[in-house]
Amino acid sequence: MSHIQQAVDIANSSTAGNDLKKQALDFLQQLKSSEDAVQVFSQYLQDPVASDVGRFFALQVLSEQALELPANHEKLYALQQSALQFLRTQLENSSSDGARVSGVGQGSKGVKSTPPEFVRNKVAELFAHLFYNMYGEVNNNMWSSFFVDLIQLVGIASLRDSKSTGVEFNAIGLDLFFRICASINTEIGDQAFVRSKEVQLKNNELKDYMRVQDVELLSNIWFSALLNCQQLPVLASLVLQCVGSYISWIDINLIVQQSYIGTIYEYLKFPQTKLACGQCLCEIISKKMKPADKLQLLSMLNLTDRVVATGSAEDLDVLEQMAKLTNGVALELSMVMDQCNDSQELQSVSSAADEQIINVVSPLVLKFMAHEYDSVTQQCFSFVTNYLAVMKKLFALGGKPGSAVAVNSKRIPIDPAHLNFLKSLGTVCVLKMKIDDSCDSIDDNEEIDEFVENIRSKLKTFQDSIAVINPELYFDIISDNIEQSITEQQDWRVLELAIYQLHNFAESIRNNLFGVNKTEISTSKPAQLMEKYMTTLLNHPTLFQMNNPLVQISFFELVVRHNNFIQVENKDLTLLNIFCTPFSMFSGNERVRLRTWYLFTRLIKTSKPKLSTDFLSMLLSKISPLLSIKASPLAQELDTIFDSQLYLFEGTGVLIGANVNNEYEILDGVLTPLFADLEQCISAQVKNPQVVLQTHHILMAIGTVARGVHSGLVPDNQVNNAKVSERVICKSLIEKFSNIAEVILVTFSYFNKFETIRDAARFSFSRLIPILNNQIIPFASRLISIFLNSDLKPLEMGDFIGFLGQMIHMFKDDDNCYQLFNNLFTPVVEKVFTLETQLEQESSTSSESKSSNGKNVIVTDSFREKINLKKSYYGLLATFVSNNCTSLLLTESNKNILPRVLTDLLSYTAEEIHETSTMKLSINVLVNFINFFGTGICTDPKDRNAINVNKLDGLNEFFITTSIPLLFEIPFKPEYEFNIQDGGCRVIACDLSRLLKALYNINNSSTNNNINENACVKYLTEIYFPQIQFPQSLVVEFINALGTLDAKQFEKYFVQFITNMKQ
């Protein structure tokens, strides 16, 4: 035993070395796993020198054993006896003169040491586990006298039948008994845990047995304890916890009796037990019952009077619990009301519940909601949400016509009592929406954000519900609030609330919560008032002198999202000028500055103002200081600044593209400084990280300006329409963008060894395509050549292939583009295969290295990169198919690489087979290749260049002899582990069937209907099937299915064929 204690002391020591601690832990773990663990640790528990930590560890071991040991096992009985003996010893060591032990867990004069709480909780867990495996018929009645034995052992038998005060009992024993009861409920009754069906069935059987045998006994003990523990707050809290936790699954009539409830109520008077009492009462009223019974229970409990009697000057935790209790009563009443509303027979129950809510409970709910502490307010949200939902069904007059809420409302005329409730609720919402006076918008960002997310957003939802129920009342509440606060000049919190309410008001109009006809929304009274408020706000005497981030950002969020309500003269000019002030984009506060840079562009992209070049020149001169790029590789925050700066470049591009004079010389004012910076970067003797990052940022800015110009020129719904772009883009703009393309290429040629520059060059170049259209092709040829001569990483290559796919899609009908790809296809494919080879080598090396460490790692990072690269590459091949350019693969320039392309499509490793998306893509490409040039001739009728390529002899035979073995090897080779029951494998099987059907179809002759003359069938029957010793009966069936079934039918046949063969 001394060795165990020594090991525990070392393991728990803060000064022992790691090696020594490891030895101690290993020793304890060895004992824990030994056959005689129960005996060893049972003996240790009885050792007088055992420490509390040691006893905790021993109890933990025995507790685990109690769950793991099989039923009727002799060790389980031995463990039971050890646990009882330990409990008996603890009670003897802690004994005193009964109920005088008031400091449970703390000791008191004349009392020997009481086990600490963590030990008592572990004792409770041990007995709960013994209960779980020994109690009741489900455990063959191994210990069905569990509760009776414990009651006798812990010295609380005097409480069994007593219904009076002054009863003597062992306080420590009662403490342990209640903890055991609570732990048992955690095992079998706690709904917070998700349990398996088998465990839940056992739990139900245990509860059923308890209900019959012992629950009444327990309820008597609890009641007796409540009568005798008013001076023992720890014990009182424990018994209240027991009552609250068991109430959900025991007969409520055992508890809900006048004397029992009255005794529970007494504990609301004592500060130390108010919290536990409130929690207990919450559980009681949450008991599932029929609506009429629940109403009767709530009426009998009369909890609101009790809550009022507790007063308001309470500890915050108690106040929160009282608010939660009040909310619980109100919520249950509203649920009763909701359940009865649609039943004519239960209308009286519904009305009675509603009357209690309106006249009794809701005033208290609103009082708690209006409390200064948000944590108290929050407790009432679930009732308000539920009750408003009920009121919508009864009274709603608003909501979008045709919406569910409008259709389902009974439209009962609202009475004064309910109208008064809504009015009071609206007033509380307005009161609580205001940011607390203790908050500072500069220093308390997190606190304010939490308030907005958890409190304000919910209050807004309540406001919106009021709007739907009674639009006129909502209109009066919110307009009064805005009227009183919009002209505020001193308190920023009041003005911020006004702006927030303006946003809410505008949203309610936009979402038509007022229920007006769609055509009348813009001319409705709310919309006209909103326009008036926006004008008032724009003419606010002190708003734009405020230096308050929350007010500043809220204002710009409002005017950008709801600028349609701004009806002042020269609206666009007014707003853009406001943006160009220290109140906005030039603010000294970075949060304001960066957010308004984004909102500036969002406003421009939404409204696309048609500005004259004179005003535009003036505006650009104002914001030009913000367009100066200063990259710093050491400052992470500057990257954030640059990301926001890109919004400014896009916004200026949109303004230039949308200018009313269609003049684009003004673009030079933005681009010339950028070009000058690029020249400095290019001429730098050393391309250090500063220079590289500066170059990257400038290229990104140029591309973003280009995107903005195109967005300004072309309507949003036509941005991808090349013909529309061609009509609106003038020659001078094309010349400027050709110059931009040249600048990008020159820069790229100097910096192509840097990955960030390659990314930026590709990004910027892609943004030039919509404007230059097919005039981009000569520049693209040079760009692609530089890329192919660069040391690309796999991810980059994937992105680059995506860029090539974009080019093919856009210019598939351009002869120059066709010739470009005719020249570049082979180099691109070779680059892909070179990278794949490198990744295979890295993957192999990585796997060997990790295997040597004893780990079986199949998928390495290199393998994943290879799969992603293959996916991009197969996507490029699919692009040639979908854009009718497959003849490219048959040209003189590319026919030599074609065998390698096809071999790659026909070769897979075991790991690649289970990459379903990649496999599906590759087989789909192969099927299309067979369909379009499987015979050696390009047969795609839409391919404009098909007539210009010669036939490739032997291609048909190649496809047959390589594809057919693949069709049978993938499903049946053991190393591929192909599971036809798996969804991914079934998809691959379906694709393989289409591959075989394609081979069969291209070899069909229109003049010869003899299936045996089909080259695909001949290879199967004469060469492949005999080679693999395929049964002749199946050969006939398989060939018949291939020849007579259509593609969909053969797909089903092939899947079933694989299924049958693998059985």
From Swiss-Prot:
Functional note: tRNA nucleus export receptor which facilitates tRNA translocation across the nuclear pore complex. Involved in pre-tRNA splicing, probably by affecting the interaction of pre-tRNA with splicing endonuclease.
UniProt keyword terms in alphabetical order: Cytoplasm, Nucleus, RNA-binding, Transport, tRNA processing, tRNA-binding
Similarity remark: Belongs to the exportin family.
MF terms (GO), sorted A to Z: small GTPase binding; tRNA binding
GO biological process: tRNA processing; tRNA re-export from nucleus
Main location: nucleus
Gene symbol of the encoding locus: LOS1
Signal peptide range: none
Source organism superkingdom: Eukaryota
InterPro entries: ARM-like, ARM-type_fold, Exportin-1/Importin-b-like, Exportin-T_C, XPOT
Pfam families: Exportin-T (PF19282), Xpo1 (PF08389)
Subcellular location: Nucleus; Cytoplasm
Protein name: Exportin-T
SUPFAM superfamilies: ARM repeat
CC per GO annotation: cytoplasm; nuclear matrix; nuclear pore
